[in-house]
Design a protein with these regions (language model features):
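A short catalytic or substrate-binding loop motif that flags glycine-/basic-rich loops and adjacent residues
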Residues: 7-9, 83-85, 106-109
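Donor/substrate-binding cores of folate-linked one-carbon enzymes
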Residues: 1-80
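PAPS-dependent sulfotransferase catalytic core
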Residues: 76-91
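Generic secretory/membrane-interface signal
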Residues: 1-2, 82, 143-146
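An anion-binding loop in the catalytic cleft
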Residues: 88-159
Length: 159
């Protein structure tokens, strides 16, 4: 989520040994991948899990036999992210469309993104895209209702 939220174009996996500190141990392997412009967190997670398991399977035999070792981590280059909460998914449709789309991509799994109408009805955004410098909502779930097309919702709201 952090890479998508930051607008990064690449991310990757690190296979590390554990020590007493969080994300601190020596590194056995690292590999980067490119993030597509439309990829969401759940889609990216599938690719990262596959990549991580492939790298782990490839390095494990040599590590067990002592043919390869771990490299100390450069803690100056380490990156950290914050804990995500449900409140992080709230958006304001008046905000920068680029930033809203980053949130959509990062939080499309959990917590999802949503906004509130003036009457405090929560609208969860299930599908969206970025097109012509605009955040375009395609599918929503209004609080207490079933998923629907955003165009139909807006049309019915105006009737």
């Amino acid at each position: 989520e952090g890479a998508l939220l930051a607008g990064d174009t690449e991310t990757g996996v690190s296979i590390m040994l554990l020590d007493k500190e969080m994300d601190h141990g020596p590194i056995l392997a690292q590999e980067k991948i490119t993030i597509s412009e439309t990829e969401t967190a759940p889609e990216l997670l599938v690719r990262l899990i596959k990549l991580g398991s492939e790298r782990w399977t490839a390095i494990l035999p040599d590590y067990i036999c002592g043919k390869s070792g771990a490299t100390p981590q450069d803690h100056e280059k380490a990156t950290y992210t914050k804990k995500i909460t449900k409140a992080d998914g709230e958006i304001n449709l008046a905000d920068d469309p680029v930033e809203i789309y980053k949130k959509y991509r990062a939080y499309s799994g959990w917590p999802g993104i949503y906004y509130f109408l003036e009457n405090r009805t929560r609208i969860a955004i299930k599908k969206a895209r970025f097109e012509h410098d605009a955040f375009v909502i395609e599918r929503i779930v209004p609080e207490g209702k079933k998923e629907m097309d955003y165009v139909d919702y807006k049309k019915n709201a105006l009737d």
